[in-house]
């Protein structure tokens, strides 16, 4: 069975990049798209921006 955290992630779209596209930009883009939250998954250096409801 899948972890609840894995099932929560719905839309991953942009590569996170320190100094260019970080958690703040990811969060802003997710809110603009109508999601409740957004974060770089699995981390800020190698992750992608994933939005959750």
Curated annotation (Swiss-Prot):
Disulfide bonds join 12-51, 16-40, 26-49, 30-50. It comes from the Eukaryota. InterPro entries: Defensin-like_dom. Keywords: Antimicrobial, Disulfide bond, Fungicide, Plant defense. One of its GO terms (biological process) is defense response to fungus. The keyword Ribonucleoprotein does not apply. The keyword Disulfide bond applies. Belongs to the DEFL family. This is Putative defensin-like protein 53. It comes from Arabidopsis thaliana (Mouse-ear cress).
């Amino acid at each position: 069975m899948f972890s609840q955290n894995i099932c929560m992630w719905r839309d991953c779209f942009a590569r996170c990049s320190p100094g260019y596209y970080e958690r703040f930009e990811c969060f802003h883009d997710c809110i603009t798209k109508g999601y409740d939250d957004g974060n770089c998954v699995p981390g800020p250096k190698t992750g992608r921006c994933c939005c959750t409801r």
